[in-house]
């Protein structure tokens, strides 16, 4: 979960070059310093951790979507699954007692507009509360402003729809303005209603590069740590994977 900053980072350095890897580390260090020195009300990881705890422990959400609006981060949701779920998926507190409150959430997601045609139906009109992190970038990597502007319009538009929704009155008014007959309005209007008031977090970054990626990953690590402290759990063990491995070892002998 956290090995990329140490010796395992050698493979990253070989892949992207040492100069880029150094920028990656510099970005992570900047977020480390921000987390250590910034006051709580301006501390990004702490504020996001508190928002997550509010959504989970007070609003009853048990899941979180990670939606980066760039295909370059298509593996980020999978990475954060391990980082968040293995770290905080615990039901025993630091004193060894059973916990009677919700801790680690189910983490999942996908990239940009692809996910809009995959699972956004459930987020918009389903009966489950699914807070989402929307990760966007102000500047395109390749200078294609037209494509990037379309991407960003979807980035903002989806969050606006989740926040504001659309009332029955608004739906009917729009259908009337399009000269749709009353029978069709009565038949279809309710299907077009969006409740809104769905929690989202907008994480807007200037441009995707090694430094900003280092800051982003470090930010999520500090969110994990902060939640673990508040929930009074050990975020850096993984007892939950042990039993399956022990049983698998015994079963392998029998299978062979």
Task: State the predicted function of each range.
Residues 31, 51-55, 80, 148-167, ...:
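Charged, low-complexity, helix-prone segments enriched in Lys/Glu/Asp/Gln
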Residues 1-26, 195-239:
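Short alpha-helices
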Residues 55-56, 184, 215-217:
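Short, flexible segments with low predicted structural confidence
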């Amino acid at each position: 979960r956290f090995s990329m900053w140490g010796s395992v980072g050698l493979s990253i350095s070989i892949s992207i070059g040492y100069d880029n890897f150094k920028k990656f580390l510099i970005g992570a260090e900047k977020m480390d310093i921000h987390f250590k020195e910034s006051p709580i009300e301006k501390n990004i990881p702490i504020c996001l951790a508190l928002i997550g705890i509010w959504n989970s422990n007070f609003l009853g959400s048990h899941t979180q979507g990670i939606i980066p609006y760039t295909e370059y981060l298509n593996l980020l949701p999978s990475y954060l699954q391990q980082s968040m779920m293995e770290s905080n998926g615990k039901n025993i507190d630091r004193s060894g007692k059973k916990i009677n409150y919700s801790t680690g959430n189910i983490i999942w997601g996908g990239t940009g507009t692809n996910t809009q045609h995959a699972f956004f139906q459930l987020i918009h009109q389903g009966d489950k509360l699914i807070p989402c992190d929307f990760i966007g970038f102000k500047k395109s990597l390749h200078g294609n402003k037209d494509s990037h502007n379309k991407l960003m319009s979807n980035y903002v538009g989806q969050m606006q729809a989740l926040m504001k929704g659309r009332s029955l009155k608004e739906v009917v008014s729009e259908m009337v303005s399009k000269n749709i007959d009353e029978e069709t309005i009565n038949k279809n209007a309710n299907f077009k209603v969006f409740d809104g008031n769905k929690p989202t977090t907008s994480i807007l970054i200037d441009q995707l590069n090694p430094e900003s990626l280092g800051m982003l990953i470090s930010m999520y690590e500090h969110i994990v740590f902060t939640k673990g402290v508040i929930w009074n759990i050990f975020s850096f063990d993984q007892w939950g994977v042990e039993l399956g491995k022990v049983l698998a070892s015994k079963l392998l002998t029998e299978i062979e």
